[in-house]
């Protein structure tokens, strides 16, 4: 083992593999295009997730200031277009990589750090579906909005479950060391929890039988993802308590815990709203219970946010964090928690929570701007392609 920046041993990783984003190789200059596709980092879709959730958060106008409504909708729509463009490009590149360089993709899937990041692909598709339900009506005809949500939700849901099972199997049979447990393992669970958020906008556009099926699938996916989140949470807690802190390269992954917390707070509310007609006289009770449960989960997020900020400060005091694509972990999780805060603030009609949402949103914008700028710079210089 090698020592990390905080004095502890770095996690054991398989030979010829690197932490998320990779450590730059001895090569200089950009790699050839074929090599870029073959060695494509599986976490690129995190940029889609981060940009799409920022579009949603912006469109919701944190602070709920009437004077800002038009600007919020306009900026949210612009960010949505950018997210669509990123999603289209990344989908094509990911498909080419799996079709032409399957061995390289499978090798990454078996990596204890990179493997979980394959779930950013379905995560990106599902967050685009959620974004389409919020921002889409301003950009697309009503029929196109519903069709696009259906396609993104179907494809994203299937891939979310498949990749979650596949990555879990690589861990079960690969017996990785305890020190390799990291916050990236939250990605498959949070992506599964997003499934009901992508399915619920379709409930109003289908018949009663299909609506009941969509709600049942939504609750089932929620249970699957939430319980997986709790299992990973226990593993990561033990790893942080019983072992030295992860190396600086893995510091951003500790923020990913905010993702499942934020989405887990949002999904019950979305399911309750979508099922109003089907729940009948029980609908008000379901709504209240969903709001209470979501608020309780959100409360845990405050604790996790405090831990994530404190650990980040500790890492920064030990030295600068090396930039890599894993920095996108600062965006979607915080964005999901921000959207959850906005939603709960308006459910409770609590101005104080709305103020908290504004602070979280400003932090989200700051992270997104910095990470986007660093990504563009590293891409232009060719450093982003080195593994």
What does each model-identified segment do?
Residues 2-95, 100:
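N-terminal signal-anchor module of multipass membrane proteins
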Residues 94-102, 130-143, 169:
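Transmembrane alpha-helix boundary signature
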Residues 151, 155, 182-308:
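Generic multipass alpha-helical transmembrane bundles of integral membrane proteins
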Residues 28-60, 76, 80, 102-130, ...:
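Juxtamembrane helix-loop boundaries in multi-pass membrane proteins
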Residues 285-346:
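Extended, compositionally biased non-globular segments
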Residues 49-56, 80-83, 87-94, 127-130, ...:
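Helical transmembrane-bundle signal
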Residues 297-298, 354-370:
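Small-residue-rich transmembrane alpha-helices that serve as helix-helix interface/gating elements
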Residues 64-70, 206-215, 275-286, 315-319, ...:
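Extracellular/periplasmic helix-loop-helix junctions in multi-pass membrane proteins
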